[in-house]
């Protein structure tokens, strides 16, 4: 195992040999400030979803429905790595930063595709983690921040890639790892942990953005005596999972960060009777102190592996002639949730299924708490089939929102279901702690009589009604980008296409086949008045796992090549 000091020395060595004269041709680096994060320029993409509200929307419109058919690749860059490339390219005035599987960061001239530097992290041989990916970096001042799969937070010099500091967030040996892009606000860099299948106790932690000193740590499972602890019997709270593995949203007015939380552990709810707060919830944390201000639990005593880790989109919408200061969450459980956010409270407004869902029978009209068809709830020694599958109506790929058209765009999967049965499992630190019995074809099946799986859906947030759906035979693992050019960009299908859709009706206006399937988050930026679209291709992780199961179920042998490439597109000069 490499110690921290050796890691820093080696990483610095690799940065120094690849540092080139490219940086000399770029403008001086523009430090990222609180003001720039709260009011991001349309020419840049400074954070995971482009803005604190997680809209995934850009006001750039040079590329639009009238000319997108002319879009062409202007440069590409091979990462040299396999597995799932899921991170967005983060762009600051010509400097692009892309993270990859195995915790590399590549700094690139966003005009030309020339590499400026590369950070290589050397990971310990005994690392146990379920998802060898990374979902992006964060920027602040003249630094780049990375959350690593060996559970460290690293601060690097944005111009050279030299490590400034790194801190251990938790001990990876106990099953903790990180895949999310950090969230920076209120002078803190905030991260959450993965490991819900490895017997962890989830949390969100904050560190001083300049020094790395710990600021606060808030667990997602309350300890005995804390509010909500009664929902965890005995010692189950110590190993109950509830990870936080996607970047949160942030409301500067309330100084509150909103985070999604994952499944309880083991998977079968009968091993931990109770609601299991704050699993499968949105939690509101004070960015200064970490205090839990409010929560909404989407479903209780999860037994389906339906993580609800996607951060809610902060959207103010109309209901009954009134404006709701709202949050919208397309749930993994297959329901589209509309909530209201107050400074110290989250209120349920309404929710409806956006894919076929056969577990919930009713929702409480005041709280949104679902009741279940218990024949659809697997348990220890009890097999149950349910829809949607364990990957849900939408897994981690983020939705996007156009505030002008009022349309929310959801990358959905319909008509796929799971069969699961639980078995007893013994806890061992850092080892799988799921308690799921083996099953034929992984317990995966497609609903009879259906002809597609993947979808791109558009919903009007003010009416709560679906506007249109575009369907694909393939599953869909494509994050979504929306632009003022009335366009939606998405990859995600197993045919390796990256597509542009008419945001008004879902018509495919342009498509480009790439080297691999696209599970990266697309972004847009502009330089010298010219708009670019950027995305990473690179199939792997759960998209490939689901493909393997579909091949078994359908009797097919559909092969999706792996290999990461950063693609950048623009209109011809």
What are these regions (language model features)?
Residues 24-73, 220-227, 370-376, 445-446, ...:
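Blade/loop signatures of beta-propeller domains
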Residues 45-49, 84-104, 128-153, 177-201, ...:
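Repeat-blade elements of multi-bladed beta-propeller folds
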Residues 109-112, 157-160, 209-211, 287-289, ...:
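Short loop/turn segments that connect beta-strands within beta-propeller blades
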Residues 202-213, 275-290, 454-461, 553-572:
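Beta-propeller blade signature
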Residues 54-170, 482-483:
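N-terminal cofactor/phosphate-binding cores enriched in small/glycine residues
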Residues 523-573:
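Blade-level signature of beta-propeller repeat domains, shared across WD40, Kelch, NHL, RCC1
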Residues 414, 442, 448-507:
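Loop/turn-rich, solvent-exposed surfaces of beta-rich toroidal or solenoidal domains
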Residues 77-90, 118-138, 166-181, 198, ...:
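Extracytoplasmic beta-rich repeat domains
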């Amino acid at each position: 195992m490499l110690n921290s000091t050796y890691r820093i020395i080696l990483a610095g060595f690799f940065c120094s040999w690849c540092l080139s004269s490219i940086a000399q041709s770029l403008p001086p680096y523009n430090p990222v400030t609180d003001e720039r994060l709260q009011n991001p320029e349309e020419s840049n993409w400074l954070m995971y979803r482009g803005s604190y509200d997680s809209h995934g929307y850009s006001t750039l419109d040079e590329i639009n429905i009238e000319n997108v058919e002319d879009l062409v690749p202007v440069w590409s860059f091979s990462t040299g790595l396999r597995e799932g490339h899921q991170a967005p390219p983060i762009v600051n005035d010509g400097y692009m930063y892309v993270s990859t599987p195995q915790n590399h960061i590549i700094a690139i001239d966003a005009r030309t595709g020339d590499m400026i530097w590369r950070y290589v992290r050397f990971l310990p041989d005994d690392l146990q983690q379920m998802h060898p990916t990374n979902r992006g970096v964060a920027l602040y001042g003249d630094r780049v921040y990375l959350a690593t799969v060996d559970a460290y937070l690293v601060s690097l010099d944005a111009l050279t890639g030299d490590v400034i500091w790194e801190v251990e967030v938790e001990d990876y040996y106990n099953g903790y790892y990180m895949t999310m892009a950090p969230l920076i606000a209120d002078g803190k860099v905030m991260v959450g942990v993965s490991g819900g299948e490895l017997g962890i106790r989830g949390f969100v932690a904050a560190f001083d953005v300049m020094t790395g000193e710990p600021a606060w740590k808030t667990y997602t499972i309350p300890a005995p005596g804390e509010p909500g602890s009664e929902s965890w019997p005995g010692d189950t709270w110590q190993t109950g999972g509830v990870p936080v593995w996607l970047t949160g949203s942030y409301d500067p007015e309330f100084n509150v960060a909103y985070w999604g939380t994952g499944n309880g552990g083991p998977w079968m709810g009968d091993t931990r009777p109770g609601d299991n707060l704050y699993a499968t919830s949105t939690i509101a944390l004070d960015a200064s102190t970490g205090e839990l201000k409010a929560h909404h639990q989407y479903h209780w005593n999860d037994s389906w592996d339906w993580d609800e880790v996607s951060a809610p989109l902060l959207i103010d919408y109309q209901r009954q002639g009134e404006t709701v200061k709202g949050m919208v969450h397309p749930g993994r459980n297959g329901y589209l949730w509309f909530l209201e956010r107050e400074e110290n409270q989250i209120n349920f407004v309404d929710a409806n299924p956006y894919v076929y869902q056969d577990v919930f029978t009713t929702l409480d009209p005041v709280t949104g708490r679902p009741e279940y068809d218990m024949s659809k709830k697997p348990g220890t020694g009890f097999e149950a089939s349910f829809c949607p599958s364990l990957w849900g109506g939408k897994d981690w790929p983020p939705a996007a929102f156009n505030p002008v058209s009022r349309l929310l765009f959801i990358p959905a999967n319909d008509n796929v279901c799971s069969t699961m049965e639980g078995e007893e499992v013994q806890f061992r630190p850092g080892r799988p702690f799921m308690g799921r019995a083996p099953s034929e074809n992984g317990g995966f099946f497609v609903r009879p009589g259906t002809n597609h799986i993947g979808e791109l859906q558009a919903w009007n947030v003010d009416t709560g009604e679906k506007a249109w759906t575009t369907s694909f035979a393939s599953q869909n693992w494509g994050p979504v980008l929306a632009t003022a050019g009335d366009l939606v960009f998405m990859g995600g299908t197993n045919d390796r296409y990256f597509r542009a859709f008419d945001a008004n009706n879902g018509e495919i206006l342009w498509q480009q086949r790439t080297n691999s399937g696209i599970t990266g988050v697309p972004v847009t930026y502009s330089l010298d008045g010219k708009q670019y679209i950027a995305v990473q291709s690179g199939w792997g992780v759960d998209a490939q796992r689901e493909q393997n199961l579909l091949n078994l179920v359908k009797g097919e042998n559909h092969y999706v090549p792996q290999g990461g490439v950063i693609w950048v597109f623009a209109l011809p000069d």
